[in-house]
C-alpha cells in the first residue's frame, strides 16, 4: 500500500532527523553561533555576542524581491484554485505546515469562508477530503459539526470497516480528531481511537519509510504541534518525494522565508542578550537559572508571526521574571521572607522594598522597572495604561507560589483539585498571556481588560495543560533543589491504594480534556483577536517540548529544534 508524494511531504515534516550539513569555508575570524548560545544549559556567552552580531545572516534587497515575487505568484495560484475543492485545501494544509501562512492569511480566510458556507462541500464521500476540510475549518475557528463523519459509520454505529484500507483517509481522520471540543464531539473521540488502532496495525505491514510517516502522524498531530518547529526538515522530504508543480513553488518560498525569519530571530536574541546583561540579575542572584535563550524560545514559539518582533523581545522579559521569582520561592527564600515579598508585591510598595533582603530587593526593583517599561510602551501605542493589571498578575503569581511554599514548609500535601487550582495560577501562564494581550493591543477596552483579568477559560485551559505536563516531567526537571509537589503525588495520597500509573493516566486524560476546552474557546465567536488565540494555542503546543526531559535532565528535542531554527542554515 503506497502513500502519495504529497502525503510523504505533509506527514514527514514532523520528523526531527539530523540533516547532512553542507561544508563551507569559513573566515578565520568566524565564531560559531553555538559557542555563544549554549543550548545545553540555555545560557549566553556575553563576550561573543557583539562579534557574532556582525556575522548574523543579512539578506539582500534582491532576496526580499524574490520572496515578494514568489508570494505574489502563489497568491495567484491560490486564487485560481480557490473555486476548486480538494486541491486548494491541500495547498492551505501545506502552507500552514510550512509555517508560512502569515503571507496568505487573507486568501486562506476567504477560501475557508467559502468552504464553510457552501453545503455541497459536506457531501464529500472521500474520507481524506472531508476530514481535511473539517480540520482546516475547525483550525480556522469555524464550528463545523462533527456529525459530518456519521456517513462513515455502519448500521451498528461503528466506523465502517471498508475504511480500513484507506491509509491517507485514516491519517487525516486522526488529525481531525485532535480538534474535538468536548462531550458533544464524542464521534471525534471514537474516530481518534478507531484511526489510531488501524494505523498502528498498518505500521507493522509497511516498509520503514512508510511506517515512519504513520508514526509521525500519530506522535505529532499537526494541530498540537508548532508548524515552524516541525518544518525544519522540508528540504529532505521535498527531495525524497520528488515533488513538482505548486509544491515546488512553496518549497522555494518557504526556504527564503525561513532564512528571513531566522535572521530576524537572531537579531532579537542579540537584543535579549544585551538586555539580560544590562539587567545584571544573574550576577546579583547567582542561585537563579541563567537561561535567557530558553526564555526567548518561549516568546519565539508563542508569538510566531514575523511582524511581532518587538513583542517577542518584550515578552521575554516577564517570562524571565517568572523563572527568577520561581527560584526565589523554590530554592532560596525563607517562609518569612517570602511572605513579606508577596505582601510588598501585592501592594506594589516601592518604599517598603528596603525591608526585603538584598536579593529580593534587586528582583523587585528590576521587576518594577520592566513592568513600567512595558506599561509605557502599551500606553504609547494603544492608549491604555496596563500597569495596574500587570501588577495584579504578579501579585497573583506570588500568592500562588507562597501557598505552595507553605504547603512544603508544613509538610502538608493538599487534595489534588486544590493543588491543581493553585497550580493553574503558579504555572505563570496567566502572567504571560495577560502581557501578550496588552502587547498585541487588540481589544484593549474596559470590557476586554476586565475579561482578561478574570482568567477566562482560554487562559485556564492553557495553564492546565502546562501545569499537568510539568507535573508529569517533574522528576526529570533541571534538578532544582526545591520541591513543588505534583498532581500525581497529591492524587496518590488522596486516593489510598492508587498506583502512580493510574494517576499518570488520569493526568493524561485531563490534559486531553483541557485541549478540548482550549479548542472550544478558539472557535468563533470569541472576544479575542486571531493573534491572541493563536498565542494561546502556540503556548500549549510548546509545553511538551519544554517539559520532555531525558534522564540527563536535558531537553534533547527542544535543543535540536533550537539549533535547527536559529543556528543552522538552509541553502537556497
Curated annotation (Swiss-Prot):
Binding site for Mg(2+) 2: 326, 330
Cofactor: Mg(2+)
Any GO molecular function: magnesium ion binding
Motif segment (DDXXD motif): 326-330
Lyase keyword on record: yes
Short name of any one Pfam family annotated for the protein: Terpene_synth_C
EC number assigned by the record: 4.2.3.-
Residues holding Mg(2+) 3: 478
Superkingdom of the organism of origin: Eukaryota
Keyword Electron transport: no
Sequence positions that bind Mg(2+) 1: 326, 330
Example GO biological process: hydrocarbon biosynthetic process
Protein family: Belongs to the terpene synthase family.
Main function: Probable sesquiterpene synthase.
Protein name: Probable terpene synthase 13
